Design a protein with these regions (language model features):
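Non-catalytic accessory segments flanking enzymatic or RNA/DNA-binding domains
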Residues: 3-158
Length: 158
């Protein structure tokens, strides 16, 4: 679960390696999005286990049922928030469509080993895929976002 500005859909979800996504609310401002997220995080984790993300595709969830359960569980506090902030300040999206994502991965690693360019500036391996911000090599994974400002060279070998 997380906050995504509508102009960043689906870019942010792809960058995070999401297998599925479902918009569930639209709010008037950033502060309200934080308040809604604070409510819902009582029931839904907002952290991703990056190692599990890179071990393969997770079983799909029934996101519509999850959304409906959250709406039922938090109906009163969400309604109170909208009443406090004004009509239309919190719009629950009951009919949004689930979005499924797939990534070009030929083989997921059995054990996750993370490359760190600060500790070892030379990384070699056969590219097995890309998921979110991670390159998956047969020698380990590398978080490209972590090394955004680094200058690298790439050599392709047969």
């Amino acid at each position: 679960m997380g906050i995504t500005r509508h102009t960043q859909v689906p870019t942010r979800w792809l960058d995070q390696g999401a297998a599925q996504a479902l918009p569930i609310a639209r709010v008037r401002n950033r502060r309200l999005s934080g308040l809604v997220e604070d409510l819902l995080r009582q029931q839904v984790a907002d952290k991703t286990n990056w190692r599990a993300l890179l071990k393969g595709d997770a079983a799909p969830l029934d996101l519509e049922a999850e959304r409906d359960s959250l709406f039922a569980q938090f109906a009163q506090p969400l309604a109170a928030l909208e009443q406090q902030e004004g009509p239309g300040s919190v719009e629950l999206l009951n009919n949004a469509a689930v979005i499924d994502f797939s990534y070009p991965v030929s083989e997921y690693p059995n054990k996750i080993t993370s490359h760190n360019l600060d500790k070892n500036p030379l990384v070699a391996g056969r590219l097995q895929g890309l998921k979110g911000q991670y390159l998956i090599l047969d020698s380990g994974v590398i978080n490209l976002r972590k090394f955004t400002s680094y200058q690298v060279s790439l050599a392709v070998m047969d």
